[in-house]
Amino acid sequence: MASSDGARRRANRPAPTVRYPRPVASSWHIAQVNIALLRAPLDAPELEGFVSMLAPINALADSSPGFVWRLQSEAGDATGIRAFDDDRIIVNLSVWETIEALGLFVFASRHIEVLRRRRDWFEKMADAHLALWWIPVGTIPTVEEAEHREAVIRERGVSSDAFTLREPFPAPGSNVPVPSQDRWRYPTTSRPV
């Protein structure tokens, strides 16, 4: 009898949960800079769709899991901050707890709507337009540092000093593998949050 009781107990157990490695209280955050070359001035009719999405997408970022900080002026966005020696370039500079948190915001939230329409609003850039790098927790990156990290990718390619979501590097001293970009680009949820 005891063996059939044991079999019943085993049959009623839930299936084991698969757990992906997660970094524990890391001393590093991920900084990201993304630049875009505007097709027209921000007040032009052809950019109305982009401008109308700024506030809701920024609010979504601010409330997203893993979000830490973003560059913004008193207006609440960074469109008025000049960088990269071109008045048509706008800069997005932010800090996230993990690469995964950043990737999920970019590819699995309503932010994807901006990506889908980027060709309507921005010129194609020949050079690097995205750079990621690890920073100690509590550090806020500067626009000058962001320009430097993009220059690193342009001049030397991706490395642990500056990399992309497509070719990420783990945090310094970490033995936790960096999740594949495919995990963010093709999430299991069918609708952006």
Where are these regions (language model features)?
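Short S/T/G/P-rich N-terminal loop/turn motif that feeds into the first structured element of a domain
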Residues: 8-87, 104, 128-193
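Generic anion/oxyanion-binding catalytic loop in active/binding sites
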Residues: 59, 91, 100
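Short coil/turn motifs at secondary-structure junctions
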Residues: 39, 97-99
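Serine residues within intrinsically disordered or low-complexity segments
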Residues: 3-4
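Tryptophan-centric aromatic hotspots in well-structured domains and transmembrane helices
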Residues: 69, 95-96, 121-122
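An amphipathic, aromatic/His-enriched active-site/gating alpha helix that lines ligand/cofactor pockets
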Residues: 86, 99-127
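A structural signal for the main folded, soluble domain(s) of proteins
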Residues: 86-95
